[in-house]
Amino acid sequence: MLALLGATTLMLVAGRWVLPAASGEANLKPENVEIHIIDDNFFLKWNSSSESVKNVTFSADYQILGTDNWKKLSGCQHITSTKCNFSSVELENVFEKIELRIRAEEGNNTSTWYEVEPFVPFLEAQIGPPDVHLEAEDKAIILSISPPGTKDSIMWAMDRSSFRYSVVIWKNSSSLEERTETVYPEDKIYKLSPEITYCLKVKAELRLQSRVGCYSPVYCINTTERHKVPSPENIQINADNQIYVLKWDYPYENATFQAQWLRAFFKKIPGNHSDKWKQIPNCENVTSTHCVFPREVSSRGIYYVRVRASNGNGTSFWSEEKEFNTEMKTIIFPPVISVKSVTDDSLHVSVGASEESENMSVNQLYPLIYEVIFWENTSNAERKVLEKRTNFIFPDLKPLTVYCVKARALIENDRRNKGSSFSDTVCEKTKPGNTSKTWLIVGTCTALFSIPVVIYVVSVFLRCVKYVFFPSSKPPSSVDEYFSDQPLRNLLLSTSEEQTERCFIIENASIITEIEETDEIDEVHKKYSSQTSQDSGNYSNEDENSGSKISEEFPQQDSV
């Protein structure tokens, strides 16, 4: 054990000290006083300045800081050498400060006490090498590691389950092919070759405290010959809705398989936990290279899964253990959100589960919270909130402003922050505020009063434009009354219809008399017809027609 004292060391500085004056006595002084603590082993070591002085012994005392109760340090009383082991001292608390003092003795003469600086044993302790037990398979080595210290160790009593172990392994024939792995107290090293000698060494670590121990002695072991029944390989486990599917590869047919699992926390506890492996439901004596088991048979957490094969020749070794995290296999779908404007300065947001999520009942297995992000549609500045509720309100918003919202579901208290992808973005406009309503009313009233005025102005403008650019083709009535109807009427008559004087040659007087009478009658009729025509606005050419008739009759008389 003393060979390991070159690590963590507490230096106890001692000054020059002298035995009581006596004739011929030499001055003695201890030098380089050191304390080494490895696990529960305590060592005190120093150098003597004068080895020529005989019959000099050394003794040490200790006390808990502040108690003023010095006790003899067991194992370090009247020591003739320059080192002592005081591991037998029963310390009740390794986190309390301890004071040490040491002196030289020669017969009845003693030096004065020299005290060293107080120290805390736990802080000065070094992690020692673990004990290792090996067992060989054809392609693997089984490790059984005991934590540093004894079973009843007080130094690591609170840390026995916190140790992690680092293994360096190599083929005995070639130390250049080293490989380092981190293992649990009960673990396996895989991917080895049959019938090969492998050597390894192990050291323990407390990672949270950043403390690394020293390596164990080197252990060597031969792997066995190749097993007749090979082990299954490439273990995989997948989640599919409400079930888990366990798959593996196997090169031969006509084999049956068995699968087991172990809660991961057993791996951290030192000791043999082979009896803690449990049979996976629906995965015993299966003939296919997969098996299916329901989600509800497993509680939330991390498991290790292993498979082995059996046939007429025997049973294989267990396959390589596969870590299985139920949380990592859980599929969380994005939520469905709806947004509604409540007032001019708030929006109501409702978060619901998608149909896929409802079918998988994820929210029943794991409590969910929602990460909600919202922002103004015209801005990239986002605000993020976490909500356990599925209905909540965003207050203190701007009126008549468009806000956009998206959300995702997270597993509550999950260290890996596992969650779904974000939902579709939904945008909604807030309602108008009181000021906006007032301006809306004023604007509406102004528009109602302005419309008639605008219509009137436009109509007047159109009249002016029409009068200037599109005048009427008919002259005004004041001008038209100066024009008589007769000239206009005559202008419209054709040349053939103009009035002419007609001359007749009369040979028979009796006929003339008849004609005159007839003319008188016609004249009266003509006047009446003319008056009637003037009243009605129509004109008749009846006199001309009558004349023409008479002229037609005269030739008949002539012919007689």
From Swiss-Prot:
Residue(s) of cross-link: Glycyl lysine isopeptide (Lys-Gly) (interchain with G-Cter in ubiquitin): K526, K527
One Pfam family it belongs to: Tissue_fac
Residues in compartment: Cytoplasmic: 459-560
PROSITE patterns attached to this UniProt entry: FN3 (PS50853)
Residues carrying Phosphotyrosine: Y467, Y482
Signal peptide positions (record): 1-24
Extracellular side: 25-437
Record's keyword annotation contains Signal: yes
Sites carrying sugar chains: N47, N55, N85, N109, N172, N254, N313, N377, N434
Biased composition (Polar residues): 529-540
PTM annotation (Phosphoserine): residues: S496, S536
Keywords, ordered alphabetically: Cell membrane, Disulfide bond, Endosome, Glycoprotein, Isopeptide bond, Lipoprotein, Lysosome, Membrane, Palmitate, Phosphoprotein, Receptor, Repeat, Signal, Transmembrane, Transmembrane helix, Ubl conjugation
Annotated stretches, region: Disordered: 522-560
PTM: Ubiquitinated, leading to its internalization and degradation. Polyubiquitinated via 'Lys-48'-linked and 'Lys-63'-linked ubiquitin chains, leading to receptor internalization and lysosomal degradation. The 'Lys-63'-linked ubiquitin chains are cleaved off by the BRISC complex. Phosphorylated on tyrosine residues in response to interferon-binding: phosphorylation by TYK2 tyrosine kinase creates docking sites for STAT proteins. Phosphorylated on serine residues in response to interferon binding; this promotes interaction with FBXW11 and ubiquitination.
Subcellular location, record wording: Cell membrane; Late endosome; Lysosome
GO biological process, one term: cellular response to interferon-alpha
Function according to Swiss-Prot or TrEMBL: Together with IFNAR2, forms the heterodimeric receptor for type I interferons (including interferons alpha, beta, epsilon, omega and kappa). Type I interferon binding activates the JAK-STAT signaling cascade, resulting in transcriptional activation or repression of interferon-regulated genes that encode the effectors of the interferon response. Mechanistically, type I interferon-binding brings the IFNAR1 and IFNAR2 subunits into close proximity with one another, driving their associated Janus kinases (JAKs) (TYK2 bound to IFNAR1 and JAK1 bound to IFNAR2) to cross-phosphorylate one another.
Annotated protein name in UniProt: Interferon alpha/beta receptor 1
Source organism per UniProt: Bos taurus
